[in-house]
Amino acid sequence: MKLLAMLGAPEDAVLRAAQLRAQGISGVYTFEGPNDPFVPLIRVAGQVDVDLMTNVAIAFPRNPMQLAHLAFDLQRLAGGRFTLGLGSQIRPHIERRYGVDFDHPVARMREWVEALRA
């Protein structure tokens, strides 16, 4: 069984990941909150032997091609231990925080994932 723990702020990411690994945690995750979900993972990749994942990275405010490049590079830096988790978030959050339309979220997410896989 794999145990995962939340990573937290980017400035403490490497130290926290190393401490968690020493405690038997096999992977760390981030989410779209007060910090960018990718920066802590980039800091840990190649430094600590743990699985890395975004629990939820919000898709719609991002460009799928740019995120595809970021995920590809992070996967290489992590030696194949990165998992990208995406989410759509809720309408008020997307429209107010990011100023992005939230029309047809299921169809948009499908198109988004197809573009990401391309």
Put a short name on every predicted segment:
Residues 1-55, 61:
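N-terminal beta1-alpha1-beta2 module of alpha/beta enzyme domains
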Residues 2-6, 64-118:
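Flexible, glycine-rich active-site loops centered on histidine and acidic residues
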